[in-house]
From Swiss-Prot:
GO terms for molecular function: ATP binding; ATP hydrolysis activity. Required for the expression of ribulose 1,5-bisphosphate carboxylase/oxygenase (RuBisCo). ATPase involved in the activation of red-type RuBisCo, which tends to form inactive complexes with its substrate ribulose 1,5-bisphosphate (RuBP). Catalyzes the release of RuBP from inhibited RuBisCo in an ATP-dependent manner. Activation of RuBisCO involves the ATP-dependent carboxylation of the epsilon-amino group of lysine leading to a carbamate structure. The nuclear-encoded subunit plays a more critical role in activase function than the plastidial-encoded subunit. Belongs to the CbxX/CfxQ family. This is Ribulose bisphosphate carboxylase/oxygenase activase, chloroplastic. Forms homooligomers. Forms heterohexameric rings with the nuclear-encoded Rca subunit consisting of 3 of each nuclear- and plastidial-encoded subunits that alternate in the ring. Coiled coil: none annotated. It is found in: Plastid, Chloroplast. It comes from the Eukaryota. ATP binds at residues 75-82. Changing residue 193 to A: Abolishes ATPase and activase activities.
Length: 293
């Protein structure tokens, strides 16, 4: 077919509406605080895939966009949430048949003795076919300091599937950026098959406070203005501590604050309780954290 003389047309707006990917992108905006660079990158990937679909409809050759991805960033920055939305986008655009997300770590793929790794990895891949396989902390698959480690066998099987069955499965490798960079350097064959790299920045203290307020609202709780100020101080201190995990750490802190609130209420058995009493986190419920002692 001559591209220049073809009179075929395709309506971008109609195709865009039919795929309903705008709903997914809107959900992403609504559910995730901040992360503008991540949202922009996901929109770019979605646009590329939609254009590729339109090209195929007009009989043009597919650009064969690489679908395997790398999500890098600290824990609790929304990588799994975005992976779930990406699976939905890929499904709505027809790149995968089912659209489900399977999340695994090294333990789900690698066996402890000879002959155990291949069946474990193949079973995971079988379960993930037609969807997206999200491998968290993927760098733990590769342990060059241990010659008897079976992670390399799992990587080899993943490579074969990424190359030969890329129409049926998308793999997302995830983890800390520095460790993932070393992982790709050590496994160039794998790195060459990962076309889309998305970096997830850490949240700011103010963004984490907003996330915390949303988490509480979803459980029909609220913080007093004074409690919000104290919780912001808590976040700033907690960010300086080891093992900080962004939104995950915020959720854990709020769970403990609700526990202290319940104990505070329980300590006044004679008091008649209002709805406000039951839904409100006070500053003292946060100040009793060890970070303030």
């Amino acid at each position: 077919m001559s591209v220049q003389t073809s009179q075929q047309t395709v309506n971008l707006q109609t195709e865009f509406k039919q795929t309903q990917i705008q709903e997914v992108l809107d959900d992403l905006d609504r559910e995730l605080i901040g992360l503008q660079t991540v949202k922009t990158r996901i929109r770019e990937i979605a646009a590329l895939l939609l254009v590729d679909r339109l090209r195929q409809k007009l009989g043009l050759s597919s650009s064969n966009p690489g679908l395997h991805m790398s999500f890098t960033g600290s824990p609790g920055t929304g990588k799994t949430t975005v992976a779930r939305k990406m699976a939905d986008i890929l499904y709505r655009l027809g790149y995968i048949k089912k659209g489900h997300l399977i999340t695994v770590t090294r333990d789900d793929l690698v066996g402890q003795y000879i002959g155990h790794t291949a069946p474990k990895t193949k079973q995971v891949l079988k379960n993930a076919m037609g969807g997206v396989l999200f491998i968290d902390e993927a760098y733990y698959l590769y342990r060059p300091d241990n010659e008897r480690d079976y992670g390399a066998e799992a990587i080899e099987i993943l490579l074969q599937v990424m190359e030969n069955q890329r129409d049926d499965l998308v793999i997302i490798f995830a983890g800390y950026k520095d460790k993932m960079d070393r992982f790709y350097t050590s496994n160039p064959g794998l790195a060459s098959r990962v076309a889309n790299h998305v970096n997830f920045p850490d949240y700011t203290p103010e963004e984490l406070l907003m996330i915390g307020k949303i988490m509480l609202q979803e459980q029909q709780y609220q913080m007093t203005p004074e409690a919000e100020k104290v919780f912001l101080q808590y976040i700033q201190r907690r960010m300086e501590q080891p093992h900080f995990a962004n939104a995950r750490s915020v959720r854990n802190a709020l769970d403990r604050a609700r526990l202290r609130q319940a104990n505070r209420i329980f300590a006044t058995p004679g008091k008649k309780l209002t709805k406000f009493d039951l839904v409100t986190i006070q500053a003292e419920d946060i100040l009793k954290s060890r970070l303030f002692q």
